[in-house]
Regions:
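Catalytic loop of the DD-peptidase/beta-lactamase superfamily, centered on the K-T-G motif
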Residues: 25, 42-60, 68, 72-275
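Hydrophobic core segments within long, regular secondary-structure runs in both alpha-
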Residues: 10-14, 268
């Protein structure tokens, strides 16, 4: 059957009460964050977040990145080669074993996979039952690519991502055009919340206003003054305020969980060797 890939009832999201008392825990909003921010943009400016980004950022600064693709974009978009949606044998074993047999870190992974927070962030929002699996080719469908799902389906090139973060790393302006004020960048990249994150396996993620300021296991946080975001398949983009440089890595073949950010980590290390 056709699965709903995005929220269509914004009022339902607006009526949703916090799952936990605000300020008591940190829980990653895998999909809903983009709709919440996008609705603010739409009500203030009148344009959708995808249209606003296209007209005010992508076109003005020559950044090859879109939220909601047109036919021309689709014609040059690489297909994603995702891992099977079914739990692999190792995960199945972890879920089946009693907790007293598991190391503490593996126990945390198991508890997170079984938790309501994980299901709400990654499964229920996509209307997928925890016993179901999405078809592995759903990100390659035209309906997914054309939709505006700001927190999940932005499409772009590594150079486009690097250019975006490079502009932010250099003060927010380029060629006499301003993307963001330096004070706004400083505020947005100052940690506002810190893990352990109840969705992201209790890892000590640090978030600013949308940006990851420290993302364990990835390049983000290996140096002072870094901010950016990681992707579910292993993609990574970040800015380094101290070195005034942007970084972008994209991959169309999803990396396994144990090697998720291995390539971006290796590339980032080489970058800093050069710098």
């Amino acid at each position: 059957r056709q699965r709903q890939m995005c929220i269509r009832d914004r009022d339902k999201l607006a009526r949703q009460e916090p799952i936990r008392e605000p300020g008591t825990t940190q829980g990653y909003h895998a999909v809903t964050f983009g709709y919440l921010v996008g609705e603010l943009v739409r009500r203030i400016d009148g344009r959708s977040l995808g249209t606003y980004f296209k007209e005010e950022i992508a076109e003005k600064f020559g950044i090859d990145f879109v939220i909601g693709m047109n036919e021309e974009d689709i014609s040059r978009c690489a297909d994603l080669l995702l891992l099977s949606g079914k739990p692999n044998l190792l995960i199945q074993m972890v879920l089946a074993l009693p907790n007293w047999l598991l190391p503490e870190q593996i126990k945390i992974v198991k508890q997170t996979l079984q938790s309501k927070e994980y299901a709400k962030a990654f499964l229920e929002i996509m209307e997928v039952d925890e016993n179901e699996t999405l078809p592995t080719d759903y990100p390659n469908s035209d309906s997914w690519r054309k939709a505006e799902i700001p927190a999940a389906n932005g499409h772009g090139t590594a150079s486009g991502i690097a250019k975006f973060f490079g502009i932010l790393a250099s003060g927010g302006s380029r060629n006499s055009q301003k993307m963001l004020n330096p004070d706004t960048i400083k505020d947005a990249t100052t940690p506002k919340t810190t893990g352990p994150d109840v969705v992201l396996f209790q890892a000590p993620y640090k978030f600013g206003l949308g940006y990851q300021v420290d993302a364990p296991f990835s390049p983000i946080g290996m140096k002072e003054g870094m901010f950016g975001h990681t992707g579910i398949a292993g993609a990574t983009g970040f800015a380094d305020l101290n070195h005034k440089v942007g970084f972008g890595f994209t991959n169309n073949r999803q990396h396994s969980l144990g090697k998720l950010y291995r390539t971006s980590n290796n590339l980032a290390k080489k970058l800093y060797e050069i710098l």
